[in-house]
Swiss-Prot record:
One of its GO terms (molecular function) is structural constituent of ribosome. InterPro entries: NA-bd_OB-fold, Ribosomal_uS17, Ribosomal_uS17_bact/chlr, Ribosomal_uS17_CS. One of the primary rRNA binding proteins, it binds specifically to the 5'-end of 16S ribosomal RNA. Belongs to the universal ribosomal protein uS17 family. The lineage of its organism: Bacteria, Pseudomonadati, Bacteroidota, Bacteroidia, Bacteroidales. This is Small ribosomal subunit protein uS17. It holds the Pfam family Ribosomal_S17. The gene is rpsQ. It comes from Porphyromonas gingivalis (strain ATCC BAA-308 / W83). One of its GO terms (biological process) is translation. Part of the 30S ribosomal subunit. SUPFAM superfamilies: Nucleic acid-binding proteins. One of its GO terms (cellular component) is cytosolic small ribosomal subunit. It comes from the Bacteria. Keywords: Ribonucleoprotein, Ribosomal protein, RNA-binding, rRNA-binding.
Length: 84
C-alpha cells in the first residue's frame, strides 16, 4: 500500500501524559438521519509521538500506520498549530 493512500485525520491533542503517545480528539459534524439536525461527533485516537513534542491543545495531523501497541495505530505527521 502506498504511503499517500493512508488515512489522515486532523484533531486536537487532549492528553500527552503517556511516554511517546498522545491522545488526539477528532471532531466532525454529521447529519441526523431522521431529524436532519447536524450533530457534533468526537472520536479519540492514540497516536505515536516519537520525540514527545506535542502539548495539550495543539492541532495536529495524524496518519494511519501498522499496529504499534494494543490501541495505537496512528502516528504524528505534523503539528499544524501550537496551543497558546
Amino acid at each position: 500500500m502506498e504511503r499517500n493512500l493512508r488515512k489522515e485525520r486532523v484533531g486536537v491533542v487532549s492528553s500527552n501524559k503517556m511516554d511517546k503517545t498522545i491522545t488526539v480528539a477528532v471532531k466532525w459534524k454529521e447529519k441526523h438521519p431522521i431529524y436532519g439536525k447536524f450533530v457534533n461527533k468526537t472520536k479519540k485516537y492514540h497516536a505515536h509521538d516519537e520525540k514527545n513534542e506535542c502539548g495539550i491543545g495543539d492541532t495536529v495531523r495524524i496518519m494511519e500506520t501498522r499496529p504499534l501497541s494494543r490501541t495505537k495505530r496512528w502516528r504524528l505527521t505534523e503539528i499544524i498549530e501550537r496551543a497558546k
